[in-house]
Amino acid sequence: MELEIIKHNYILFRDLLRAVAIKTVAWPHGLGSQVEWIVGNMRDEDEHVFLKDGNKDMAYMTLSPVTGLLDGVQTSFSGVGCVCSANPGMGGGKLLLISINQYFDSENYKGLLFCKKSLINFYSKYNWKLIPPERVHFSTPHEGVFTMVYNCEDVERLEYDDRFF
């Protein structure tokens, strides 16, 4: 298994189609709306990440460089979004998360993700830590969003006014 990471400003249309093929499993929207969302919401510095087994795409996610105030210190994060597997329940998401954690460890990156309550246990299995909601302060309210971090010690407070990814 290996990661293929493509900066958004270098992605080819055929690679967008690969991403959409995996995303459609979790988010059943049409090809046009999926491509439109990616083009409209991703920035040049964002990255598309594919977990590959040989030539086969197993899973997909996005990484977005963002910042937040972590315990009073301006901190750079790699924001994890759109984690999805080509074959849900077969371990692709797990292997992708393990691989991205290894990548974060090797680069000394801090990870940040936002998720639904139902996904907290999944991410927790792979050393992502939930920040209690009362310790997270968004510039605009976001109900039902849970915040998790990777490669961060105990967080007393996160102030976040960057974009959602």
What spans do the regions from the language model cover?
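Terminal substrate-recognition subdomain of acyl/acetyltransferases
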Residues: M1, I6-H8, D44-E45, F114-F165
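A conserved beta-strand-loop-helix scaffold within acyl/acetyltransferase catalytic domains
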Residues: H8-C84
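Short Gly/charged-rich anion-binding patches and loops
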Residues: R18, S99, S118
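Conserved acetyl-CoA-binding loop-helix of GNAT-fold acetyltransferases
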Residues: V80, M90-Q102
